[in-house]
From Swiss-Prot:
Catalyzes the condensation of carbamoyl phosphate and aspartate to form carbamoyl aspartate and inorganic phosphate, the committed step in the de novo pyrimidine nucleotide biosynthesis pathway. Disulfide bonds: none annotated. Pathway: Pyrimidine metabolism; UMP biosynthesis via de novo pathway; (S)-dihydroorotate from bicarbonate: step 2/3. This is Aspartate carbamoyltransferase catalytic subunit.
């Protein structure tokens, strides 16, 4: 990171375990129902080039709970639709008084470009197929709450790994904290090359193997909107990779089930699993606000 530049959250890959643990510790103390004035007078701009429900709303709530003002800018309701460049949009937002920008963008690396040109924190809310750092952090917090540790855990991530920025952030994050990660899916959606993203990653195309003895099972949806040049047989996918109660039983008895959303019931998992006793899906949503409060406070309270 260049000198004189404010701290930003651009990805998990470049973070050290010390930084990750500090954010998780702070997030665990955050209470979304208790409003405070930590960021009073600050303005957080939510710049979303792609649709979002959980991420956008939880960042907005997190900022408001901390006392900040939020402004939402979407691609379809701004000059972006007229062809304005990312950098010019960033300059405009900064001139309006933004103290931080939370951005989701379809292009990998867009946040790094914006951070090079602006003197305010940039927070990555998802960039293409690259990373989704706040999701990785909230997943880690959810696992920590359920398991009290990371070291020695087997975490199976099942589904469309190739197109998933969530998977990439988790692959960078979880091994740093001592967990073993197994990626599982059909070859087109989980190619062997995914094991090269980080050290200690295993790739398997056999669901039974991936789930056997797992402490955490993370299901991912098939991102049909990104399936360019790749084919998937829905019936074959369901038969071989859908998480059912029977498949989940291959994991440890106290295993937890996670999903970043949106869920496609009947595709990557069944309703019995999504709504079952092992499910931590709603806990993930709740922890999203806590983690994003911690991110905003860490980056803005000191800038």
């Amino acid at each position: 990171m260049k000198s004189k530049k404010p701290r930003s959250l651009l990805g998990i890959e470049g973070m050290e375990s010390k930084e990750i643990n500090a954010l998780l510790k702070l997030a665990a103390r955050m209470e979304p129902t208790r409003r405070r004035n930590t960021l009073r007078g600050k303005t957080v701009v939510l710049l979303f080039y792609e649709n979002s429900t959980r991420t956008r709303s939880s960042f907005e709530l997190a900022a408001k709970v901390l006392g900040a003002t939020t402004i939402l800018i979407t691609a379809t309701a701004s000059s972006i639709e007229k062809g304005e460049s990312l950098i010019d949009t960033g300059y405009t937002v900064r001139a309006l008084g933004a103290d931080a920008i939370v951005m989701r963008h379809p292009s990998s690396g867009a946040h790094w470009l914006l951070a090079e040109h602006l003197d305010i924190p940039i927070i990555n809310a998802g960039d293409g197929m690259h990373e989704h750092p706040s999701q990785g952090l909230l997943d880690a917090l959810t696992i920590l709450q359920a398991k009290k540790k990371f070291k020695g855990l087997k975490i199976a991530i099942v589904g469309d790994i190739y197109h998933s920025r969530v998977a990439r952030s988790n692959v960078h994050l979880l091994p740093k904290l001592g967990a073993k990660v197994v990626l599982c899916g059909p070859p087109d959606l989980c190619p062997d090359e995914m094991a090269k993203i980080a050290s200690g990653i295993e790739v398997s195309h056999n669901l039974d193997h991936a789930l056997s003895g797992a402490d955490v099972v993370m299901s991912l949806r098939v991102q049909k909107e990104r399936l360019v040049g790749r084919q998937i047989g829905v019936e074959d996918y369901i038969a071989n990779y859908q998480i059912t109660p029977e498949k989940l039983a291959l994991a440890k008895k106290d295993a937890v089930l996670m999903h970043p959303g949106p869920i496609i019931r009947g595709m990557e998992l069944t309703s019995e699993v999504a709504d079952g006793h092992a499910s931590k899906i709603l806990a993930q949503v709740h922890n999203g606000v806590k983690v994003r409060m911690a991110i905003l406070q860490t980056l803005l309270a000191k800038n």
